Amino acid sequence: MSRMIFLALLVLLLLGACQSQVDLSQPPEIRYGEDVCTKCGMIISEARYAAAFYTVQGEARRFDDIGGLFIYHAENQEDVAQFWVHDYETEEWIKADQAFYVTSDQLHTPMGFGLIAFSEQDRAQRLASKSNTMVMSFDEILMSFVDGSAEHEHFDS
């Protein structure tokens, strides 16, 4: 009888462990107005600027500004399952390495990085032309944070 109880408890533990695992192929959930930014500790309130990732161990990292994600990664070099950003206009999640980025001091983002993402290059190009800047790739943005050339200025609302 005690063996049967032991097996039942083992099965329950295994089922519980399986249910608590996260899907690393999906972005972490962000509860806007509640969750705080991993980098700066501010409440994440706007989807269009937010970004996130899971470490390969399944730990979620959430950011109120796309630039915060990049600078955090440059400083911490965690093993990342997948970086995620929001499309600035549609607010849909997109894989960060498939996004097109526009950066400009005319774009007032939560932490002042002035960095936004688009899922389509033509929409990114339209805004870049208006802002007298260029469209950049994930690798170009990542390198600008790694080498320290990315700028950061906090704007008060």
Features from the language model and the residues they span:
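Sec-dependent signal peptide recognition
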Residues: 2-9
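C-terminal motif of bacterial Sec signal peptides marking the signal peptidase cleavage site
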Residues: 14-17
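Short, flexible, mixed-charge glycine/proline-rich loop motifs
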Residues: 25-33
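Post-signal-peptide N-terminal segment of Sec-exported extracytoplasmic proteins
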Residues: 32-71
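Mature extracytoplasmic domains of secretory-pathway proteins
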Residues: 62-94, 100-101
